[in-house]
Amino acid sequence: MAATGQNLAVVVHRAGDLRLENRPIPEPGPNEVLLRMHSVGICGSDVHYWQHGRIGDFVVKDPMVLGHEASGTVIKVGAGVTHLKPGDRVAIEPGVPRETDEFCKTGRYNLSPTIFFCATPPDDGNLCRYYKHSASYCYKLPDSVTFEEGALIEPLSVGIHACKRAGVTLGSRVFVSGSGPIGLVNVIIAKMMGAAAVVVTDLSASRLQTAKELGADFTIQIKNETPQEVAAKVESLLGCMPEITVECTGVQACIQASIYATRSGGTLVLVGLGPEMVTVPIVNAAVREVDIRGIFRYCNTWPVAISLLASKRINIKPLVTHRFPLEKALEAFETTKRGEGVKIMLKCDPTDQNP
């Protein structure tokens, strides 16, 4: 198999400046593979880099290819690659450690400060026709798992990591704050891990309906309630305060509601990223021994996710609501910015636009 044609890529130059450009087709190193990209999802972080040119300390200083929720086909392997061959369909884990530091040695490579991560400045992403990546972080997809499911393993991994950090187990009562793509994958995984009841909050009625379809037991459409009122509604629906809360919005009022809602001795996991400084009722959490935990991306999740998808124990296909060919990427980004649908997928292979 050979790379042919142009390497069309979606490139952000600075805040508000998003372009479709042709990039050189890369040559894989000894431990890398060259991929013909198939499906790449648009993440909120991609839109944020486009709109603002930065996320926290990660600043777009040079043109950067976006995209990190991805799958594709191997078309060339480096000399040292033995477990993959041309023609293999793979899902891409976007974070690749650059060194074996203390975090890698303890299995928490996501915390390595020098990690390569697709579409995080200055590292290019994979929203393009052809892309090279570390072979060790490309995972072969079973025939029963589609390319789109392979791309969705990235957001699904956030749910796996968050629910593991939260300690979801058989019989857990769980509150998920926010029903965007990340809130929805947390619903899926919480139920998969044995949660007895899951309640979800959001502003959008349509997204809450999707949450119900994916397994949520109860939903609350937020209007103008105070954080304490939201917490009271959560308790009323569950019949008790939840032992576990997964906050997926990053909005100050939602974090406040999450603290008030969580049962004494319970766990709150902060997944959504908002302003660097927020005002929260920390004393309320402290005196009730509510453990507040963060997560940063994920680690050791791709094999688990592939096994779950191959076994058909979970269904993430309903997350994809819109599809665009790569040539219409700018239209796809505008659609995402307007908040339409749930997950928008870009199809990068002009010869195969199937899921």
UniProtKB/Swiss-Prot annotation:
Binding site for NAD(+): 182, 202, 207, 271-273, 295-297
Known EC number: 1.1.1.-
Topology of this chain in the membrane: Peripheral membrane protein
Sites where the protein binds Zn(2+): 43, 68-69
Any matching Pfam family: ADH_N
Tissues in which the UniProt entry reports expression: Expressed in liver.
BP-aspect Gene Ontology terms: fructose biosynthetic process; fructose metabolic process; sorbitol biosynthetic process; sorbitol catabolic process
Family annotation (Gene3D superfamilies): Medium-chain alcohol dehydrogenases, catalytic domain, NAD(P)-binding Rossmann-like Domain
Compartments where found: Mitochondrion membrane; Cell projection, Cilium, Flagellum
Cofactor: record remark: Binds 1 zinc ion per subunit.
One GO cellular component, as annotated: mitochondrial membrane
SUPFAM superfamilies according to UniProt: GroES-like, NAD(P)-binding Rossmann-fold domains
Function: Polyol dehydrogenase that catalyzes the reversible NAD(+)-dependent oxidation of various sugar alcohols. Is active with D-sorbitol (D-glucitol) as substrate, leading to the C2-oxidized product D-fructose. Is a key enzyme in the polyol pathway that interconverts glucose and fructose via sorbitol, which constitutes an important alternate route for glucose metabolism.
Family: Belongs to the zinc-containing alcohol dehydrogenase family.
Protein name stated in the entry: Sorbitol dehydrogenase
The organism of origin for this protein: Gallus gallus (Chicken)
